[in-house]
């Protein structure tokens, strides 16, 4: 049965970093990597083999973007990672709609905070049901927040949880990690599916949209980690201790016999020193 962990918290609370860490921990537990870590941005890095300029295989550490869904990465991940651990997001379907239907760029939907804060051609004054005072152009983040929450969730409150949990049920990874739990119905949906919700306390208070302020009102989370004054390493230690208490982590298979390592096709990029 799939174990589901959802991280709740405001933007920049460390939700994605926690998911990256657990990806590495799970991959090491299944002996799919020997070592892993996080870079300065909280992204997963794992040991791999790459060819040097002379064509010789050299062991190095490379970045593994666990959120990728492109064709080359999916071919590798479908057998090498996703059966054991997979990243999910309640906003995934929304982002697909914003790119495919509304014309936002992939960077605006999936990129950095700078990318998501780029202005779009959509205006507040054109938003259905909007009664605020803003009339100028919306950032990509604002557009996704409004369309995802004030339009789609207004029509069907569980639209994003239904889609995400259905995908998890169909794909059945050993561990499913959800990085963007923000609403009470999302907490309850994860728990009904047998999962657990970990709330992180760190985060910015500058965003007044309900998708951010609702985090303060969440009730019934399975655990809360006050990471406001913790380092990434200390936060990871808290997560390991917590999940071990649930019996949800640890080595699950015997280490296989040594063999020539395969490069993670399309999955790993060499980290520039």
Spans of features found by a protein language model:
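Extreme N-terminal starter segment of soluble prokaryotic enzymes
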Residues: 1-5
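Small-molecule kinase domains that catalyze NTP-dependent phosphoryl transfer to phosphate-bearing small molecules
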Residues: 6-13, 20, 32, 36-39, ...
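Short His-Asn-centered micro-motif
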Residues: 8, 90, 179-181
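A short, Lys/Arg-enriched amphipathic alpha-helix followed by its capping loop at the start of a domain
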Residues: 18-26
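Hydrophobic anchor at the start of a short beta-strand
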Residues: 29, 85, 176, 195-198
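ATP-dependent small-molecule kinase phosphotransfer cores
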Residues: 37-174
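Residue-level signature of catalytic and energy-coupling elements of molecular machines
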Residues: 144, 178, 225
């Amino acid at each position: 049965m799939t174990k589901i962990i959802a991280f709740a918290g405001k933007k920049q609370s460390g939700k994605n970093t926690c998911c990256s860490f657990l990806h590495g921990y799970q991959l090491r537990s299944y002996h799919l990597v020997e070592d892993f870590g996080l870079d300065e941005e909280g992204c997963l890095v794992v040991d791999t083999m790459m060819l040097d300029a002379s064509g010789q295989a050299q062991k190095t550490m490379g970045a593994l973007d666990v959120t990728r869904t492109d064709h080359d990465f999916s071919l590798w991940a479908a057998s090498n990672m996703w059966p054991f651990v997979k990243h999910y997001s309640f906003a995934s379907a929304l982002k697909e709609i914003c790119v495919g239907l509304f014309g936002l760029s992939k960077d605006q939907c999936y990129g950095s905070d700078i990318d998501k804060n780029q202005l779009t051609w959509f205006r507040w004054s054109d938003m259905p049901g909007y009664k605020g005072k803003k009339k100028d152009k919306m950032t990509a983040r604002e557009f996704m927040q409004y369309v995802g929450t004030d339009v789609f969730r207004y029509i069907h409150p569980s639209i994003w949880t239904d889609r995400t949990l259905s995908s998890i049920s169909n794909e059945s990874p050993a561990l499913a990690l959800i990085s963007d739990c923000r609403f009470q119905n999302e907490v309850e949906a994860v728990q009904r599916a047998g999962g657990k919700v970990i709330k992180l306390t760190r985060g910015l208070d500058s965003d007044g949209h309900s998708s951010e302020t609702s985090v303060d009102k969440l009730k019934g989370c399975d655990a809360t980690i006050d990471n406001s004054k913790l380092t990434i390493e200390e936060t990871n230690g808290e997560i390991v201790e917590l999940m071990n208490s649930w019996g949800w982590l640890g080595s699950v298979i015997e280490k296989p016999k040594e063999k020539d390592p395969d490069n993670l096709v399309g999955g790993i990029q060499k980290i520039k020193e």
